[in-house]
C-alpha cells in the first residue's frame, strides 16, 4: 500500500521531519541518529504482539519468538555493562527511575539528588515531577568556583540529612562522575546508591566513562542518547533480591504490556554497541566535543561551564553575547543549528529563558562529522551569537550548514516510503 496516497497529511509531516533532520545540525545532547537496523527492528511486526510478563513467564500465548528477542536484548545489555540482572521493559528513563525508587525506598523517605539547575534531571527530585512529590528530596549541586561536583559537600549534606537513597547522574553535567566516591558517601550514612547513567551509557559501554554498575545498588538508563538505540529505558543491578523487586515494580507495578518492537530496537542497538566500531564512535564523540571546547575557549565572550568537558556535551553560558538561552536557541534554529536552552549552575533566570545552551556531539558524530567539522560548527555558533542582527552573516552561516549536512547525510539510502 502507498502510505503517501493513503494518508498524505501524516506522510507529509513525517517527510518534513526527515528533511529537517537531514538539513539541520543536531546538537541536542540527548538526541542521536539510530541505524537502519534499529529503524527496521522498531518498525517490525513485533508491534502487533502483546506480551505481558517476562520471558518464559508470559500472560499471553504465542510469545516464543518475542522471548527470543527480549532475551537477546537482556543478554547483550549484561555483556555491555557487566550486570547480572537487566530489565529492558521500561518505556522510558523516567519510568525506569520510578520503578527503581519503588524498589529502594518508600513514599516520604529522604533521597538526595542533583539539583536540576546544576545539571540534574526532573526525576531527581524536581518539585513539579512525581519524584519530588512522592519523596522528600534534598538537592546537592556543584562547587561555585569549579562548577564541578563537590564530594565533600555532598558528604556533609548526607551526614546532615541521613537519606535512605542517594541518586548520582545528570542530564547536563560535562565532567566525569566518580561513582566510587558516591558509594563511600552512601555507605557512610547507610544509604542505598542509585545511578542514572542515561546520558553517558554509550560511553560507559565502551570504557570511556567509569562504569557505575559495580558501585550502584541499581543503575538506570535510557537506551537512546549516546547508546544510539530507540527511545526507551532499562534497569540494571547485581543484586538478585533487588532484581526481583525491579521486575515486579516494572510489571505490574508501573506498566502493562512491554513494547516488544522497541525492545527489538534495543537489542539491535546493543548488538551494535558490542562491536569495535562503536568504541571508535565513542572515541570520536569525545574528540569532537574537545575540538568544539577548544574553539569556544579561544573566544573571549564564550564561557563554558566548568571550563570544558570530559564527555559528550558542553554547557555554554551565552550572557556575554547579550542573549539568554531561549534567544540563542531561536537564533541558531534560524540557521538550521539545533540546540536547547539550558540552565547553568547558580542560574538567575527562569527555566523558560535560562543563561545557557546545551551542546552535544552524539548525533553529528553518527553522521560522520570529524574534529575539523566540529570545530567549524563551533565557529558557526559563535558567529551567529555575535551577529544576531546581521542577515547577510546569518545567510552565509546557513549556507555553510547546508554544505556540512549535504556532505554527511543522515541515511544514505533511507527515506520514508
UniProtKB/Swiss-Prot annotation:
Site feature: Plays an important role in substrate specificity: 224
Localization (cell): Cytoplasm
Alphabetized Pfam families for the sequence: SHMT
Cofactor list: pyridoxal 5'-phosphate
Disulfide-bond pairs as recorded: none
GO molecular function, one term: glycine hydroxymethyltransferase activity
Entry EC number(s): 2.1.2.1
Biochemical pathway: One-carbon metabolism; tetrahydrofolate interconversion; Amino-acid biosynthesis; glycine biosynthesis; glycine from L-serine: step 1/1
GO cellular component terms given for this protein: cytosol
Spans traversing the lipid bilayer: none
Keywords: Amino-acid biosynthesis, Cytoplasm, One-carbon metabolism, Pyridoxal phosphate, Transferase
Family: Belongs to the SHMT family.
Function according to Swiss-Prot or TrEMBL: Catalyzes the reversible interconversion of serine and glycine with tetrahydrofolate (THF) serving as the one-carbon carrier. This reaction serves as the major source of one-carbon groups required for the biosynthesis of purines, thymidylate, methionine, and other important biomolecules. Also exhibits THF-independent aldolase activity toward beta-hydroxyamino acids, producing glycine and aldehydes, via a retro-aldol mechanism.
NCBIfam families registered for this protein in UniProt: PRK00011.1 (NF000586)
Protein name stated in the entry: Serine hydroxymethyltransferase
Organism (species): Ligilactobacillus salivarius (strain UCC118)
Gene name of the encoded protein: glyA
